[in-house]
Amino acid sequence: ARDRAAVFYLGDETLKGFLHIGTSSIAVLPNEIKSFSWSPDGKSLAYLALKDNLINLVIADASGKNPKTTFRTPITDARISWVSSEKIAFQTAPSGLAEGFIFAFARSSNAFSKVYGPGFGLQSLWSPNGTQILLSQAARENGGIKTGIYDTAKKQYAALDVSTLTDKCVWGGTKEIVCAVPRDIPALTVLPDDWLRGEFDSGDRIVRIDAEKNQSED
């Protein structure tokens, strides 16, 4: 939504949030929202809120009004991405020391299903059309990172010849990805943990990836 933004901040040790709408209007969001995502068309929003030891998926209009709980899950560390009008993706918290998963919630059927996983250090970045996922995972055999593209329709994974985190990438349409790629990953680095803690200075180079041909160039 171009005319509005969701703002979150820590106040009195409580995570608070609000919507800044247009030039002057503000709508307060519930406290302690765990994750937030706009719908692809910007007309709705979704967020996760903890209640009775379950994570509630709540959908509201773009002003935060008319909230409705549509799904509950015990995956309390999940983060969401509204990847298509029909599908909201759930990603477990990434750690190179734990297996991660990606799930999808189908709005029309209320079905909740696994999309990908397990994978240590699993991170994801969905394509704008919600059909492909850029994935990064811990390469436990050498302590680095392996990066690839997963086609959700064909259920096929294609490895890329770059090693980077999805946090360092952005889709440019549905066919191109631009990434900052670490020049070196020291031994014993735990990713993405060290990166998320600000303890990994990667010294990146910029790489452009053709998502159709799975080829990259500086």
Give the role of each language-model region.
Residues 1-4, 26-48, 67-91, 111-136, ...:
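Conserved beta-propeller blade repeats
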Residues 1-24:
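Post-signal peptide N-terminal segment of secreted/secretory-pathway proteins
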Residues 10-12, 50-51, 62-63, 108, ...:
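Solvent-exposed coil/turn segments that connect beta secondary-structure elements
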Residues 10-15, 50-55, 93-99, 139-145, ...:
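Short, solvent-exposed loop/turn segments at conserved positions within beta-propeller repeat blades
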Residues 18-25, 51-77, 90-97, 103-108:
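Short, flexible helix-coil linker/hinge segments at the edges of structured domains or between repeats
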Residues 19-22, 60-62, 103-108, 147-153, ...:
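Beta-propeller blade signature
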Residues 180-201:
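Short, conserved, GDST-rich strand-edge loop motifs in beta-rich repeat architectures
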Residues 213-218:
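Surface-exposed loop and turn segments in beta-propeller and other repeat-based domains
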